[in-house]
Design a protein with these regions (language model features):
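Hydrophobic, aromatic-enriched alpha-helical segments typical of multi-pass transmembrane helices
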Residues: 1-238
Length: 238
């Protein structure tokens, strides 16, 4: 019984870390899958690239779906992990991340639909065949714009997670500071020109935060005794 109780928070932390690792890896693989296929301002070249590398394009979409599914798993596991610190804030963080996941899944349609249109899967009678590449490129241009929106919700999520990590006694406070800083950076997309300008720096900070948190959860986990102490204190307050 004691061993099971001790293993539970550590197992939750490591499952969260593994899910996060899968999320980061598949998200990066999806980016590389689409790289070089979309030519800005050239619908014909974009259509040619997509049709010539249709399997690669579909693989990128599959990676996006896996990334979203693993992110939902992270959401549930983070809620359980940080619930002893503050249940309401842990729920709020989960809420923000689920909204981000929903927006991300919606944005991926702007990768799938152009492939279907160009491949003739769904012929559009109201659009001439020579206009299809331009329509496909227009739809593809909406994906990064939608991405800017779900990044904002990830920003809110990371700010709350950063605070919870900092207030916890079972994880290093430095991870909390890093997560909050990454979240505040993501919130710069509330002013799109600023977010676009800062994107290279934000991406590096965001990736550093995710990798640091992921590796810590997988390799070290949490301080089980302190987690249980916070859990008992939370139960007493309730």
């Amino acid at each position: 019984m004691i061993r099971t109780a001790e293993a539970s928070p550590r197992l939750t932390a490591r499952l969260a870390g593994i899910s996060y690792l899968l999320n980061v890896m598949t998200a990066l693989l999806s980016v590389f899958s689409f790289r070089g296929l979309v030519v800005s301002g050239d619908p014909a070249a974009t259509a040619t690239n997509i049709l010539a590398h249709a399997s690669r394009f579909r693989l990128g979409f599959a990676f996006e779906i896996i990334a979203t599914a693993s992110s939902i798993a992270v959401t549930a596991l983070f809620y359980e992990l940080f619930k002893p610190v503050n249940r309401s804030l842990s729920l709020l963080a989960a809420f923000f991340r689920l909204i981000a996941c929903a927006l991300a899944a919606f944005s991926y349609l702007f990768h799938l639909v152009p492939l279907q249109i160009l491949g003739g899967t769904y012929p559009l009678r109201v659009v001439k065949s020579e206009e299809l590449p331009a329509l496909a490129l227009l739809l593809l241009s909406f994906q990064p714009r939608t991405m800017n929106i779900f990044i904002i919700f990830f920003g809110f999520h990371f700010v709350v997670i950063g605070y919870l990590t900092f207030r916890s006694t079972f994880l290093p406070r430095a991870l909390g500071v890093l997560a909050a800083f990454a979240g505040l950076g993501a919130l710069s997309f509330l002013a799109p020109p600023l977010g676009t300008y800062l994107f290279p720096y934000l991406a590096a900070t965001y990736l550093l935060c995710e990798v640091s948190l992921t590796l810590w959860l997988i390799i070290v986990g949490v301080d089980v005794q302190r987690w249980q102490e916070q859990a008992r204190a939370a139960a007493f307050r309730a």
